[in-house]
Amino acid sequence: MVIHKNSIIHQDAKISSNVEIGPYVVIGPNVKISENVIVHSHVNISGDTTIGDGCKIFPFASIGNDPQDLKYKGEKTKLIIGKHNIIREYVTINPGTDGGGGITRIGNNCLFMISSHIAHDCKIGNNVIIANNVPIGGHGIIEDDVIIGGNAAVHQFARVGKMAMIGGMTGVTTDVIPYGLSLGNRNYLEGINLIGLRRKNIPNKYILELTSAYKEIFKTNNLNENLNELNGEFKDNTLVNDIIEFINKDKKRPICTPFIK
């Protein structure tokens, strides 16, 4: 363990071996940091915060400080960050609130670029990339393998399905389906995230079926009727099933649909 002499670490904080902590870091009493974590200078970590193995936290990040929610009155809530995440300069990640289940949860192998913000009660999956200056509003759900471009913004309670891609400067006010490509302010569906699917080596057969199903699902604004008309046509395609399940889940925001020109 290497802790710079100019850092302030509360005696009750649980710091594992093989952790490196740079100068002018402040760590509170209820913080738990796992093995092989690197905390660069001028980082503040507070609250009931758990940080998993191998994370790297860069200068001026603020982790676990009180939620930006006027209803929050100091309740004991949590922030749980998984393994091997990279948290760049000026990133802010807030813990949960009683109104949202009390936990903000970050998965594994994510990249949070400079000045991105994860608000209270968010659920971030694995292998997510959130680019510079992107705020995720409270209670937001970002599933696995999502990429969100710079200066986009995600509305509170909005969901972004797995392997979706959000273009830079997009205002996400509606739920984006798995494998979707969403652009614009306010956001609309541009189509399927073909680049992301090919990067994951998804067989072309499944991509073609997904594209056909996408056209059927969004051929009119009546999604329920369109889903019923599929009548199990793509029941063996897990990609299509992911979209159907996503649309049918309980939701706070409407589903993002294609732009009607």
Segments the model singles out, each with a brief description of its role:
Residues 2-188:
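Structural signal for interior beta-strand "rungs" in well-ordered beta-sheet cores
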